[in-house]
Amino acid sequence: MAILNNESGEYAVNIVQDALGAPVMDADFKKIYDKFSHRICWIDGQVVPGSFQMNTAWYDAVPERDPIFMEHTHDDADELIGFIGSDPSNPYDLGGEIEFTTGGEAHLLTKSSIIFAPAGLAHNPMRILRVDRPIFHFSVITKTMYDGEATYR
């Protein structure tokens, strides 16, 4: 089997290495977001037909306004939300503190965590309280498009 570069081959279209398909943020929110977060990759059914939606980002600072992500639900899809520490010697240490609310319960995350939000469960607000080193964030929704209302303020 030959090893191909990511621009050639029948299935190269399935390899996403940027966030070009991410929804456009309004200008005011983008200014705030870019100061604490760096989106890495975004995939959904528009970027790769048939794919479900996934977002990845690094959080490396506390937002100037918190909470920035507000409570919402996804009535027709489950979601996974992850926060992973970046210390390879201690991967369970989050390297910061995130307050994440699910079902009306606020939880303080200090360890690498994945949260399951089944369809219909209210989740967020989310507050980034402390960042000692970058925190890897991802979210996965089990449908082709993230079509909910804006979850930020």
Residue ranges and their predicted role:
Residues M1-D66:
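A short, N-terminal "cap"/entry segment at the start of jelly-roll beta-barrel domains
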Residues M1-I15, I128-R153:
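Double-stranded beta-helix
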Residues Q53-S86:
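Conserved short histidine dyad/triad with adjacent acidic residue
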Residues A77-I81, G95-E97, I135-H137:
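Extracellular structured ligand-interaction cores
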Residues F83-T110, G148-T151:
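A short beta-strand-loop-beta hairpin characteristic of the jelly-roll/cupin
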Residues D87-S89, A122-N124, K143-Y146:
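Short Gly/Pro-enriched loop/turn and capping motifs at secondary-structure junctions
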Residues T102-I128:
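Conserved metal-binding segment of the jelly-roll/cupin
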